[in-house]
């Protein structure tokens, strides 16, 4: 397929996706082009996934054409609630008793290790609102109180709340926060102290967030997040034991949802269509890698594909891609897990990758650079607002970008090798991306 066909295919995807932005579609927006792509929203990662067993494949050695680095600008300039608030007809009040509380440790410092979160058992970052807790539970409790959110339990109001399942039921998580001793008034007092600050201390990033709202970026992430269970039946029946093939098939599916995601990022659709195509061509590999890395934070020694398949580290090593696979686990997945990167932060990092002013052929690189700067500013303001006790969090997030870029280029090298030897089936859209000229200067 020549480059004109590639351009028409991608630009057509952009135009079709543009008509499906008001809400997550019940039918695949690109069904007229590819009937087997299904963007939707994930319901949880706790259910068992099929595990790809190891197979053998020659180790890649070919190099792709030289491609210079994609810069991310100066590292000088958030985290939103990654959980959807669920309205409820019930008022949330401190319960007279919570099922299963007998097994919970007491919330007092004398009986609970200062290093353990009293709510979920994760690593504690200190005493928050009267209880030793992790940043995740601290932020969840604060958002619940400040936004006066109410939740509903879909089971029997006795859901297990631990490190792996704390996001499953917001109702039971909040009830446990109260039961362990978190104080609503502590959040309210903290907010009052913030209001008493001088008018001169108004966050200078607020105007940037209005131009590049992190809420919209989070919406984009949630709108195209795959329902892994929707793929399970087809994945189980059609899966091979070759992890490289399965990764390529998952990437091909996600390339279509990537178009829809980009159209939801503020101001992307305002760019000329040619520039939209160029930006997606330039960053698709890093955008997909960032997504599946974050999706895999709950997986041990493996990655979770959008198709619901779990690729284990041992399978990747047997297939000859162990080195790059280990880099994904140590430089991306592990780091995201350790800092508890949320969906809004992930979305902002992906938006920074998307708005790449160095992509070759842009009609107005300065306009793209200005959009990237707005994402920087919104992300910085977000982290300051949501993590005031982590002043280095913004810089820590940006430090994932060079690793993502390096890993993205190495993955391209592997894909070019597999395309060259022809042993791995590479589907339509992914093949087009590989055949398109590189857009990085």
Swiss-Prot record:
Region (Hinge): 183-206
InterPro entries: NHR-like_dom_sf, Nuc_recep-AF1, Nucl_hrmn_rcpt_lig-bd, Nuclear_hormone_rcpt_NR2, Nuclear_hrmn_rcpt, Retinoid-X_rcpt/HNF4, Znf_hrmn_rcpt, Znf_NHR/GATA
Keywords tagged on the record: Activator, DNA-binding, Metal-binding, Nucleus, Receptor, Transcription, Transcription regulation, Zinc, Zinc-finger
Tissue expression per record: Uniformly expressed from the blastula to mid-gastrula stages. In late gastrula stages, there is specific expression in the presumptive hindbrain and spinal cord. At 16 hours post-fertilization (hpf), expressed in the hindbrain from rhombomere 7/8 to the anterior spinal cord; this expression continues until 42 hpf. At 24 hpf, also expressed in the lateral plate mesoderm flanking rhombomere 6 and in the cranial neural crest, but not in the migrating crest. At 26 hpf, also expressed in retina. At 48 hpf, strong retinal expression.
Subcellular localization(s) per the UniProt record: Nucleus
Sequence ranges of Polar residues compositional bias: 64-89
An example Gene Ontology CC term for this record: RNA polymerase II transcription regulator complex
A molecular function (GO) term: retinoic acid-responsive element binding
Keyword NADP: no
Record-level GO BP terms: cell differentiation; nervous system development; positive regulation of DNA-templated transcription; positive regulation of transcription by RNA polymerase II; retinoic acid receptor signaling pathway
PANTHER family, A to Z: NUCLEAR HORMONE RECEPTOR
Domain notes: Composed of three domains: a modulating N-terminal domain, a DNA-binding domain and a C-terminal ligand-binding domain.
Protein name (Swiss-Prot/TrEMBL): Retinoic acid receptor RXR-gamma-A
Native species: Danio rerio
